[in-house]
Amino acid sequence: MPPESEEVLSRYPGSDKGSRTLETYTLRESAAATSADLWKGHSDTIAQGRMGVFLVTVAVLICYVAVPGARTLFGAIALLLSMAFVALIVRHARARRFERWHRELARVARSAQDRRLRRWEALERPSPPSPVDHPYAEDLDIFGRASLHTLLSSTCTQPGEELLTSWLLGPAAPDVIDQRQEAVRELTPAIEFRDELEATGRIAGPVEPEQLRLLLEWAESPAWVLPRTRLRYLAVAVPLSLVATIALHVFAIIPYLWGISIVLALAVMRCSTERIQEDFARASTGESGLRLYHTLIERVAEKQFQTTLLKGVRDGLTPGGEAAAEALGRLFRFIEMSDLRHNGNAHVPVNVATLWDVHVLVRMERWKEEHGQSLRGWMTSLGHVDALSALAGLAHAHPRWAFPELQRK
């Protein structure tokens, strides 16, 4: 262990246990960095192979053009090389993904060392200033550069950050405190789970609060198209009439009747497009933030917990019926379908022919009726695990620090 590490640890009680904790972080960082370097070497090898296959493919295509008598042979070789090139692209992406994953795990372990050794300047995320006129935040150094909040700066989600801040600034009922302590004790030795959760959040990146606010507003707002039965019927009837009138025209029964169907479709679009686009915009703006949390929610839902609070949080993500991660996956697919509006060449003809936007919004609003009121709870559940993991990280780094025992009168 470096001398400066021993000097810092010697200031704290239980330094033997602290040194073992620090050694754990050091070993985890070294193992993750080694794995990342191995995957980087693998990635570089694949990249060189891709370049080689590409150059050989170009040479084969030149031969295909230059030697007409052997085009069948060179065409077959070019096809095989193209398939190999695609396979290498997939493998390269996988290698880079694993490299980044292990690199983030190494950074997580390094950050844990920095917090344990009080290397404040090395910590990446600044702590917010203390709230004005708060009764104890400034006196107890809850926020600021060298503060309790900085020691707990391993949260990886906006809901987790907000929840942890509220816990630091406000009291809790004794029963709630007992449940939190029980959950923290369960998570303290679960270093693999905590590190993987933080690494996943780092890869996802920060989510702007405004993004989540827009999506939550959309999810909790009343449906617009579902109550409009006439509009939904028209969205089915008008495209069917277009198919029927085109058939009448093709078979020379009644020509040009399809023009009426197109006029009807344009009329429906004129009456509904502005409102539909507004809903699409709100949902898709927030979706980009929520998509980053999808993997985190999936990881938490897969974990088996034992304590009351954590089991309740997990149950909130896996209610009877469709699990939160699966439901979010469906929502993402619907929002991707709504993105057709960004393709100017395809959107107008497809929308005129099928009233595509109405059908997509119907699916999104049915999802909203089923899960919209649960979305905020899913974010809160994720925030609970994130905040409790940060507290567990502090408990793991300082094994001799006490858990207060509350006595009820």
Spans of features found by a protein language model:
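Alpha-helical bundle segments enriched in helix-capping/polar residues
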Residues: 2-409
